[in-house]
Amino acid sequence: MIEFKEFGVTFLGGGELNIDDLINAKKLAPKLIAADGAADLAIKNGFVPAAVIGDMDSVSNDFFVKHSQLIKLHETEQETTDFDKCLRNVDAKFGIGIGFLGARIDHELAALN
C-alpha cells in the first residue's frame, strides 16, 4: 500500500491525454501516480510520477533505468486493469483519474464501471 493520506492523488492512465487536464488535476491532487505505461507519457509531458503501479507490461525499460528511485508496485495478475490496481493500492485523501479513456475499449469500460 502506498500512502498519501494527506494529499490528493492524480492517477494517470495511458489513454488520451489533454495536458491542461493533467496540469489542473495536479493543482488539486499534487501526487502523480502513473498506471504502467503512463509513466512514459508523464515523462514525455514533463512530469515525474511519485510511483508507478501495474503489471509493467507497457512501461519502457528506459524509464526504469532513468528513474530507478521511484516507487514501483508490480502486480503481475491479469484479472484487473492497471487503474484498478492503482485504486486498490493507494491510500490517499482523494483521487482524480486522467487518461483512462480513449485507448483500449476494455480498459475504458472498466474505468467507467
Residue ranges and their predicted role:
Residues 2, 23-26:
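Glycine-rich helix-loop-beta junction characteristic of Rossmann-like nucleotide cofactor-binding loops
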Residues 13-24, 38-41, 45:
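N-terminal active-site wall of soluble small-molecule enzyme domains
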Residues 1-3, 31, 44:
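Short secondary-structure boundary/capping segments within folded domains
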Residues 1-16:
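N-terminal nucleotide-binding beta1-loop-alpha1 segment
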Residues 7, 25-33:
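Short beta-strand/loop segments at the ligand-binding rim of alpha/beta enzyme cores
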Residues 28, 37-113:
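Acidic/Gly/His-enriched mid-domain segments of enzyme catalytic cores or analogous surface patches
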